[in-house]
Design a protein with these regions (language model features):
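Conserved strand-turn element in the central/C-terminal portion of the radical SAM core barrel
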Residues: 103-106, 130-135, 183-209, 227-235, ...
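Core AdoMet radical
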Residues: 67-82, 88-110, 115-184, 193-200, ...
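Catalytic cores of alpha/beta
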Residues: 140-147, 203-217, 279-290
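Canonical Radical SAM [4Fe-4S] cluster-binding loop centered on the CxxxCxxC motif
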Residues: 40-80
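Auxiliary Fe-S-binding modules of radical SAM enzymes
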Residues: 1-21, 89, 218, 224-345
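An N-cap/entry alpha-helix motif that binds or orients negatively charged groups
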Residues: 7-44
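Glycine-rich, proline-tolerant flexible connector loops at the mouths of alpha/beta enzymes
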Residues: 47-50, 96-109, 165-167, 231-242, ...
Length: 345
C-alpha cells in the first residue's frame, strides 16, 4: 500500500491498519508528524500523572487493578496528592492528571472535590494555575458537575472499544456499554474537554474494529484521545483465557499507526503518547510524538505507590525524562495547559 492510496473512510482506515508494509508505515508516521506541526505545532504538552488509588469497584477482564485481583491496594492521602501536584507546579508541567480506579463512594467523591480546590489554589508563579484532568471512571452526572465546579476541566474516559460486542467480551455482564457512552456525553454536555480512547491490538479485535474506533472519536468530536497498545497482565481473566493477540512488536507498530491515522483524521486534537508504548519500546513515547502525538504524561506518583498501580505487566516505572526529550529536539510547552485547539474552536 502507498500513502497516496490512503483514504480516511472505514475501508481505507482498515486497509491501512492491516497493512504491515514498513515503508508505508514510515511514510504514514512522517506525514502525520508533518500535519501535527502544521496544525497544532511542535510543542509537547505535559500532564503530571498522579495515580491516586488502585482501589477499584469495577472488574474489567483485562485490568491489573480489577476488583477481584489480588494486589496490594493503596490510596494517596489528600496531603500526599497535593504535595505531588506541587511537584508538577515546581517543574512547570502546566497540568496534572488525577487517575485512579473507579469508585463512587461519597467519601472518595468528597475527597476529590476538596483536592481539586486545593490544587487550583497552588501558587505556580504563573497564570493560569495548574490545569487538572480527571480519569476516575464512570460517575453520575451530578458528580461530574461537582468536580467541574471544583476546578477540573478535562476528563478522560476511555471507551476501550467502540464495538459493543467486543466491549461485552472484555467486561463482565454488569458493565454497560450504553452507560459508558452516556457518561461521555454527560461530560461533554457539562463543559469538560471530554477525551476517550481504546486499547489497540487486544484479543478478538479486527482491523475494522480499530478503524471504527478512529471513526468513533471523530463522530464523538473528541478534543483529546488517549489510546495505547494492549499490554496483558498475567493474572487477568482475558490473559488466562488464552485468547490470541498480536506480538509485542506488532502491537507497538499498531499503536504508532493508530496515532498517525488519528492525526490525519482529526488534525487539531490533542493526542497522548501513552505509557503503554514505552512498555513495548524504551523510546516508545518519543516515537509516539514523532508519529503525531503531542501530549505526554510523566508519572509523578510517589514511587512506593507507583509500583502498585499495575494495570498491566509493565517493564518501566520511571517517568519520561523531559530534559532528555528536550535534548533530542522536543519543544516542551512548560507552564501551559495545552488545551486542545479543536475544543477552542
Amino acid at each position: 500500500m502507498k500513502l497516496s492510496e490512503l483514504t480516511l473512510d472505514r475501508e481505507g482506515l482498515a486497509a491501512a491498519i492491516a497493512c504491515g508494509d514498513a515503508a508505508f508505515e514510515t511514510a504514514l508516521r512522517e506525514e502525520a508528524y508533518r500535519v501535527k506541526v502544521a496544525t497544532v505545532g511542535a510543542e509537547v504538552y505535559l500532564r503530571g500523572l498522579i495515580e491516586i488509588s488502585n482501589i477499584c469497584a469495577k472488574n474489567c477482564l483485562y485490568c491489573g487493578i480489577r476488583r477481584d485481583i489480588r494486589c496490594q491496594r493503596y490510596e494517596l492521602s489528600e496531603e500526599e496528592a497535593l504535595a505531588t501536584a506541587r511537584i508538577a507546579a515546581k517543574r512547570r508541567f502546566g497540568s496534572v492528571v488525577i487517575q485512579g480506579g473507579e469508585r463512587t463512594d461519597a467519601a472518595f467523591i468528597r475527597k476529590i472535590t476538596r483536592l481539586l480546590k486545593a490544587i487550583k489554589a497552588i501558587d505556580t508563579g504563573e497564570d493560569p494555575p495548574l490545569g487538572v484532568t480527571l480519569s476516575l471512571g464512570e460517575q453520575s452526572r451530578e458528580v461530574y458537575e461537582e468536580w467541574f465546579d471544583a476546578g477540573a476541566h478535562r476528563y478522560l474516559l476511555r471507551i476501550e472499544s467502540s464495538n459493543p460486542d467486543l466491549y461485552r467480551k472484555i467486561h463482565p455482564a454488569d458493565h454497560s456499554y450504553d452507560r459508558r457512552l452516556q457518561a461521555l456525553y454527560d461530560l461533554k454536555d457539562i463543559g469538560y474537554q471530554a477525551g476517550t480512547g481504546a486499547m489497540i491490538g487486544m484479543p478478538f479485535q479486527t482491523a475494522e474494529d480499530m478503524a471504527d474506533d478512529l471513526l468513533f472519536y471523530k463522530k464523538f468530536d473528541a478534543p483529546m484521545v488517549g489510546m495505547g497498545p494492549y499490554n496483558p497482565h498475567p493474572e487477568t481473566p482475558l490473559t488466562l483465557s488464552g485468547a490470541p493477540y498480536p506480538s509485542a512488536e506488532r502491537r507497538f507498530a499498531l499503536g504508532l499507526k493508530m496515532i498517525a491515522l488519528l492525526r490525519l483524521l482529526m488534525p487539531d486534537i490533542n493526542i497522548a503518547a501513552a505509557t503503554a508504548l514505552e512498555v513495548l519500546d524504551p523510546l516508545g513515547r518519543e516515537k509516539g510524538l514523532l508519529s503525531g502525538a503531542n501530549v505526554i504524561m510523566p508519572n509523578i506518583t510517589p514511587e512506593e505507590q507507583m509500583v502498585k498501580y499495575n494495570l498491566y505487566d509493565r517493564k518501566t516505572l520511571n517517568a519520561t525524562d523531559v530534559q532528555d526529550l528536550e535534548s533530542r529536539g522536543a519543544v516542551i510547552g512548560y507552564g501551559r495547559w495545552g488545551d486542545s485547539k479543536h475544543f477552542r474552536k
